[in-house]
Amino acid sequence: MTMTRRQAIKTTLLAGGVLTSSGFRNLQGQSPSPGGATPPAPAPTGPFKVPPLPYAYDALEPYIDKETMTIHHDKHHAAYVKKLNEAVAQQPELGQMEIADILKDLTKVNEAIRKTVRNQGGGHYNHSLFWQMMKPGGGGAPQGDLAKAVAGKFGSYGDFKTKFTAEAMGVFGSGWAWLVLNGKELAIEQTPNQDSPISQGMTPLLGIDVWEHAYYLKNQNRRADYIPAWLNVVNWDFVSERYQKAMG
C-alpha cells in the first residue's frame, strides 16, 4: 500500500524525537503558568529540561490540534533538550547558565559543540517561549502600551497582522517569524531553522514556528491556513509582559 505524504510525515514526527522530561530550567527567570496539564515524565538526564505545557494538549483546539501539540512538545522539544544536554556535557560549566545567556554570546561555547548548542539550544529556547505565547481563549489584539507601540510602528494592529503574516509566509523552508524589540523599537524579523533573535541582540516578544511539524498533521502543506489559525491563540498578556520588562 502506498503511504501518503501526510502518513509519512506523521511517522517521521512520531519517530523523530526522544521523550525525556516535562520539567524545565527557568527561562530568563520565568516559569510557565502553574498547573500545566501535561503529565509528569521521568527525571531529566541533564541540566536543561522541557517545560510542561501550561494547558492541556487539546486546549488550543480547534486552531491547533491535540495530536500536533502532543508530538511537538513531547517529541520535538524533548529531542532538542536531549541533544543539548549531550552537547553541554562536554563543557559542564554551560549547564550552570541559562540558555538565554548562552545564546546571547555563543563565543563562550567551545567550537566543537557550538553549532549543536546553537541549533539544539535555540530549539529549546524558542519552544520554551512558544508554549507560553499561546493560551486557550487567546487571540484578539494587544492592549495598553504594547498596542500603542504596535500602532505607532505599523499603523494599526491590522497592518501589523498583515506584515507579520507575510513574513511568516515568506520564511523559506523551516524557521520562525518574530515580533521583536531591536533596542527600544519594534520590528518583525525572520530566523532560519532554530536560530533565535536573542543571538542577534534582539528581544523576542512573539514568535510563530513555521516548521512543518508545527502544522502539517492538521493543515498539511497549507501554511496559509495555519498562520491565521495560530493568531487566534496568541497570549497577548504574556507578550505584553515581555514588552514591559524589556522596555524597563
Which residues does each PLM region occupy?
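An amphipathic alpha-helical core segment
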Residues: A166-Q220, I227-D237
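Mature N-terminal segment immediately following signal peptide/propeptide cleavage
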Residues: G46-K82
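Low-complexity, Gly/Ser/Thr/Pro-rich intrinsically disordered linker/tail segments
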Residues: V234-F238, R242, A246-M247
